[in-house]
Amino acid sequence: MVMRQEETDNSSSTNFFVGRYSENFGQQNRIGGLMTIKNTPLGSNIGSTIDGFIRINEAQSINTILTHTVTTNTNKQGFAGFAQYYNSTNHYKIWLTQSVVTKNFDPQMGFISRTDVIGTTPGMNWYYRGNKLPFKKILRAFEPGILPEFYWQASTGKFIESSLYFFPVWLNFQSGAFFGYAITPVYQHLTEAFEPLGVTIAPGTYNYLQNWILAGTDPSKFISASVDYKWGTYFNGKLESADWRLQFAPIPHISLLAEFNRNHFMDVGEPKQSSTVDLFILQGRFALNPRIQLIGFYQKNSFDNSQSYNIRFAWEYQPLSYIYFIYNHGSFDKSPQPKQTEEHIIAKISYLKQF
């Protein structure tokens, strides 16, 4: 794919390129490559990726992605990658993921949550549907699990973070509903200030404990609902966060979703402060058939008084070939800055020929 973005008052003209190759080998294995180029008058950012998937047997598999980036105007190079082992059966799932992102890794046509980090994230879920499960007319399965996460700073090797997600309770119901509870001890060593939603957390070492409840009804029903609620200590204070979702899907062609998210900080940061940030989301999906869809999305954020909406028309005119028309609108009004608005119109056509 090749795309050019014209020069504006705030940015120079930019050329984009994405190339992808993938090939199956053996009966259940795959190897592929991806190249991205972002070119501006100041220089180019080039990303080179190889990826692979190996099916060892019915239960076990390994997949990996390795990426190298170079930015020509700074001559900085970086690397990121992960390797993941899965062992999944009807009775359990075990996995181990090892990942690394170096300090100078810079994928300007992609997204990463952080740089300069090494992550080790194993996990295990146990699936029990046996005779000792009570209330079998109501309960389908008991699926406890543990999902620890460990992180080191890649440039120094210092241990900086751990989160020990432990789900002693996870219940799947015969109705399609679910309920889960987790308790999570967290250790974090911040090397620089951290600002979640306008709250400043000073560098230092923190230990805190959070509780987590997840519940939901059968999402295939006419009306479905779910809740994601967390509470507990948070760095040097407390945090309550919740996400409520309500979906209305009267027929397969129509789906409407309303979502409300709230984060309530209590005595958090330096200096200690309390605040509440709300996020409202509305989403609609309308399908004439599986190949022609109109999708709308609206979001309002109380943190910066921002509002944004997106309307997308998608037509799959032949298998894996699409025509898109997209309209984006965004605005935010946060004092003392004046209100700012952005609008984008995008038209895209893709064609895939299989040989």
Q: Predicted segment positions?
A:
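A conserved hydrophobic secondary-structure block that centers on an alpha-helix together
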Residues: 1-43, 51
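Exposed, low-structure sequence patches enriched in small/polar residues
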Residues: 53, 57, 62-355
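Contiguous transmembrane helix-bundle modules in multi-pass membrane proteins
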Residues: 43-47, 260
